[in-house]
């Protein structure tokens, strides 16, 4: 029996804002969508792999999610670190950086 990754989920307060963020920051686009009366699921993808970022939008939710003290993150690879870093710095979304390790973290509109 083998397992493969399929997606990771982030709950969002403003679906359009989050979709815009992920497209501008990383080039992720909507692959598919599921809508119900109470919530919407949008699956974003990079166009190159099968892995998806699922955005869950609960229609009635107004208060921000408590993300706690967990250090979870979505790790991405780029073939041009310097250009990616410059773009994200210009967007003002870098929230942590470790130059020695060659990594930085960005924060999305919901604090992920």
Task: Go through each PLM region and give its residues.
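A short, acidic/glycine-rich surface segment
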Residues: 39-41, 60-65
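Vicinal oxygen chelate
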Residues: 1-3, 7, 31-33, 43, ...
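Short, charged/polar surface micro-motifs in flexible loops or helix N-caps
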Residues: 47-51, 60-62, 80-82
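Core segments of cupin and vicinal oxygen chelate
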Residues: 2, 9-52, 105
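Exposed loop/turn and edge beta-strand positions of beta-sandwich/beta-sheet ligand-binding modules
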Residues: 38, 70, 100
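Helix N-cap motif at beta-to-alpha junctions
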Residues: 14-15, 78-82
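Eukaryotic phosphotyrosine signaling hubs
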Residues: 5-7, 69-73
